[in-house]
């Protein structure tokens, strides 16, 4: 009867429920978050995505539409349930057409959000663009000068004419920052009370220092030379001006980095002595021989110091190694990335956490697109060819950087970072290609009012259809077709915008996949 209460158990935890209450709601009341893609309380259970599966009495059922019953025993976090949810997600990706991350972003080992940087530069929001760069890149001036820019190799604009000049734009932002009277200082966590010494002031060592300083640790860099930079100091000034490297050193000093020059490992420094004064040691000493590695008291490999590939740990506790001290490395970007990755592992060690490689952010990958599909991207971007700077030696000025940035195709998902499908794919370790068949064509419907509909990202959850029904939209949205050809659209071959006269904002807000977004 209405109002009757009884007890069920969820993951062996008792919870009192009211008759008619779903398992999903009961779980939420005791802090158990069951993933959902097709559930919005206002719409009620739609039972379409199957991501909210739980196990009850030996059966897998959707928790959003399963009503609690007296004595019910629910499993929501078992291995079997997790595997079922992962399979449900992988089935949704079997017909998913779109990238979570743009190819340029995926190919950057430092994970710079390049599309955001380009949009900010295009719109003249230079301080925001500088913030985007300086919150992500350890040595942006050096990278603007010397990066081998794998991002540009993956830029889809290059399939049409020329890729966006990403490195040149990054260089422009670094130059703007260096010339600013109020330089941007990256955010930093409160002091941790932990200290690290890095032996080697080359690109890997300086990158590791930048990352650890931002985690709140005290960092000292020791180097046998009289200035920071390592191999960077031998780069001809026409490729890396001295003021660029000096600016990077000042930036690190503003974060609190201490330098100890004229100190060489094996001559002035020993690991025993360093470990007495610091909580962890990173060796970024450049190329070393196996004999030199052994003289430090460490196991060696054919390349130098023997270190675990994913954790950078050496044979001695609290001693880590990265860069050319561990493996042959000729590209500055790789050395900087290596230092940053090593710093992540050292931070885990200092915080007492398990030391493991940072997982890459999940991204569905659409792959190479055809010319017809490229034209869809080009509709909302500049069709100009690549920008040639008026002063090639100085690089792009602000106007030229904006023009070049406007050539970005915006092929990243507008909902990346806030997309529930992407979030759960990361959480459950989804293999997006497990059930992948031949990809259907990419579609993008740009509406005059600013709504963008990408049918290839729609999972037919039904939320937008239900919201337009609840709001009594004059036209609304509906499921059109049958079987595998079902799609969401406005009736009578009208546009999506016609169906969202009153509910566009609400439908975009609650779309779980980015199929509906704002331009």
Q: What kind of feature is each model-predicted range?
A:
Residues 2-195, 247, 280-321, 325-510, ...:
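Ferredoxin-type iron-sulfur electron-transfer modules and their immediate structural context
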Residues 30, 215, 255, 274-277, ...:
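Conserved dinucleotide-binding and phosphotransfer motif residues
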Residues 43-44, 228-229, 267-269, 484:
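Short secondary-structure capping/turn micro-motifs that flank functional sites
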Residues 88, 251-277, 393, 397:
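A structured beta-alpha segment of the ubiquitous adenosine-cofactor-binding alpha/beta core
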Residues 112-115, 121, 159, 163-167, ...:
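Beta1-alpha1 glycine-rich phosphate/pyrophosphate-binding loop at the start
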Residues 209, 274, 282:
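Cys-dependent condensing catalytic cores that perform Claisen condensation/acyl-transfer
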Residues 209-210, 271, 332:
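Generic hydrophobic/aromatic pocket-lining and core-packing "Φ" positions
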Residues 260-262, 480, 519:
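Solvent-exposed beta-strand sheet faces enriched in polar/charged residues
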């Amino acid at each position: 009867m209405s109002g009757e209460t009884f007890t069920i158990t969820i993951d062996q935890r008792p919870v009192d429920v009211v008759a008619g209450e779903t398992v999903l709601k009961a779980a939420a009341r005791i802090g158990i978050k069951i993933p959902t893609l097709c559930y919005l309380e206002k719409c009620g259970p739609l039972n379409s995505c199957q991501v909210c599966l739980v196990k009850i009495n030996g059966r897998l059922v959707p928790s959003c539409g399963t009503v609690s019953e007296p004595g019910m025993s629910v499993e929501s976090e078992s291995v079997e349930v997790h595997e079922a949810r992962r399979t449900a997600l992988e089935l949704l990706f079997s017909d998913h057409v779109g990238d979570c991350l743009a190819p340029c972003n995926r190919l950057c080992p430092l994970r710079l959000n390049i599309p955001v940087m380009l949009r900010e530069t295009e719109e003249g929001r230079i301080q925001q663009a500088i913030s985007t760069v300086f919150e992500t890149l350890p040595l942006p001036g050096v990278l603007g000068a010397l990066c081998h820019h794998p991002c540009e190799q993956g830029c889809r604009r290059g399939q049409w004419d020329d890729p966006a000049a990403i490195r040149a734009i990054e260089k422009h932002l670094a130059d703007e920052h260096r010339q600013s009277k109020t330089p941007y200082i990256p955010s930093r966590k409160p002091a941790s009370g932990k200290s690290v010494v890095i032996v080697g002031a080359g690109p890997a060592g300086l990158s590791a220092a930048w990352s650890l300083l931002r985690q709140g640790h005290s960092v000292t860099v020791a180097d046998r030379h009289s200035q920071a930079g390592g191999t960077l100091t031998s780069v001809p000034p026409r490729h890396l001006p001295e003021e660029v490297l000096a600016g990077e050193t000042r930036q690190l000093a503003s974060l609190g980095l201490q330098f100890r020059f004229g100190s060489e490992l094996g001559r002035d420094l020993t690991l025993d002595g360093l470990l007495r004064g610091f909580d962890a040691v990173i060796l970024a000493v450049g190329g070393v021989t196996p004999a030199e590695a052994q003289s430090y008291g460490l196991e060696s490999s054919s390349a130098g110091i023997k270190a675990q590939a994913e954790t950078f740990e050496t044979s001695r506790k609290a001693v880590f190694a990265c860069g050319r001290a561990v493996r042959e490395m000729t590209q500055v970007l790789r050395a900087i990335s290596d230092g940053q990755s090593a710093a992540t592992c050292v931070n885990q060690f200092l915080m007492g956490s398990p030391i493991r490689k940072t997982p890459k952010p999940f991204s569905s990958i659409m792959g190479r697109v055809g010319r017809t599909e490229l034209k869809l991207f080009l509709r909302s971007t500049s069709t100009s060819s690549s920008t040639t700077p008026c002063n090639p030696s100085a690089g792009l000025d602000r106007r030229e950087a904006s023009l070049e940035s406007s050539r970005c195709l915006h092929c990243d998902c507008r909902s990346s970072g806030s997309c529930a499908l992407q979030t759960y794919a990361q959480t459950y370790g989804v293999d997006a290609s497990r059930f992948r068949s031949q990809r259907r064509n990419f579609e993008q419907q740009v509406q005059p009012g600013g709504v963008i509909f990408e049918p290839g990202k729609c999972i037919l959850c039904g939320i937008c259809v239900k919201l337009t029904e609840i709001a009594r939209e004059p036209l609304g949205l509906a499921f059109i077709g049958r079987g595998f050809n079902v799609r969401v659209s406005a009736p009578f071959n009208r546009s999506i915008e016609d169906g969202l006269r009153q509910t566009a904002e609400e439908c975009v807000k609650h779309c779980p996949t980015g199929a509906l977004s704002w331009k």
